[in-house]
From Swiss-Prot:
NCBIfam families: PRK14822.1, RdgB/HAM1 family non-canonical purine NTP pyrophosphatase
Cofactor comment text: Binds 1 Mg(2+) ion per subunit.
This protein's name: dITP/XTP pyrophosphatase
Organism classification: Bacteria, Bacillati, Bacillota, Bacilli, Bacillales
Originating species: Bacillus licheniformis (strain ATCC 14580 / DSM 13 / JCM 2505 / CCUG 7422 / NBRC 12200 / NCIMB 9375 / NCTC 10341 / NRRL NRS-1264 / Gibson 46)
EC number in record: 3.6.1.66
Amino acid sequence: MKEVIIATKNEGKVREFKAMLEPRGYDVKSLLDIGYTPEIEETGQTFEENAVIKAETISKETGKIVIADDSGLSVDYLGGSPGVYSARYAGEEKNDLANLKKLLKELEGVEKEDRSARFRCALAICIPGQETKTVEGSVEGYITEEPRGTNGFGYDPVFLVKDKDQTMAELSSGEKNKISHRAEALKKLSALLDQA
């Protein structure tokens, strides 16, 4: 079984990666699993830049294959915000509930057709001795007026998936892992991972 380190401490992301990679024969480890505690400063201006920073930092320190994810929510009405600041939208402390409240407050009174949004995910894979490669995935939808569902994490309870009458948080893990922005990016990354 090939070990792959996922450059995150986010348990929700780790669960999604494990569900998608372990059946394919990969031993998935998070930063917490390997005892890595320092914060990696995300200084990039794009999801892709931040994913590369994280993947290269961890791969350089461990000498292992590393996949890094930088993802977030882009709301058209808000000019693409929260974007790369999705996790810290309501402040430096990463707080899902505070982020949701801030987003919903900013969209108060905005009609559904103007609440279009997308989840975006950039994945970077750093294989020691090779050039870091990136892929992206996205899923379109709308922001609801209030949270719905208890599955998932982050903005999932307010993200109504286009062509479905369910938020990401109302989908089962299996359903979400078929259509999510991360799943789309991971499908693209699979060929690169298999070459490792």
